Amino acid sequence: MFSPQSRLRHAVADTFAMVVYCSVVNMLIEIFLSGMSFEQSLSSRLVAIPVNILIAWPYGVYRDLIMRVARKASPAGWAKNLADVLAYVTFQSPVYIIILLTVGAGWHQIVAAVSSNIVVSMLMGAVYGYFLDYCRRLFKVSSYHQAKA
């Protein structure tokens, strides 16, 4: 339907990855670490889906820029992982705060959720990067399909 070089194909892959990953990981954080009720977390995730759809491709472009800088600094695997964490935390935390404010979370819940998300992102930011790369290969985005196939 779309060529492997298609920007739309790239955007769809990035959107799929962000919606799936953020829905699962953030719901677990909100319920088990932040003390939000299931209903609050579900509301947060439902609000987050359209937000994630809007920010997924810009985040992918932002991440790719940070990855290029990291590759120039060091080709080592730790540099990629560090760049993934940095990209994820610096882009997602402000968005997450806005989502939580929108669904009526209290400041203590927001601080707990965002702080927990930052800590978890130190582990999971790199995991999201690998998941995003996997989704790009799955959707046959040209630079990922050819380079990693």
Curated annotation (Swiss-Prot):
Ranges that cross the membrane: 16-36, 46-66, 83-105, 115-135
GO MF term list: L-amino acid efflux transmembrane transporter activity
Biological process terms in GO annotation: amino acid export across plasma membrane
Alphabetical keyword list: Amino-acid transport, Cell inner membrane, Cell membrane, Membrane, Transmembrane, Transmembrane helix, Transport
Highest taxon of the lineage: Bacteria
One term under GO cellular component: plasma membrane
Intrachain S-S bonds: none
Cellular location(s): Cell inner membrane
Membrane topology: Multi-pass membrane protein
The protein's role, per its UniProt record: Exports L-alanine.
Family assignment from sequence similarity: Belongs to the AlaE exporter family.
Protein name, UniProt field: L-alanine exporter AlaE
Origin species: Salmonella typhimurium (strain LT2 / SGSC1412 / ATCC 700720)
Lineage of origin: Bacteria, Pseudomonadati, Pseudomonadota, Gammaproteobacteria, Enterobacterales
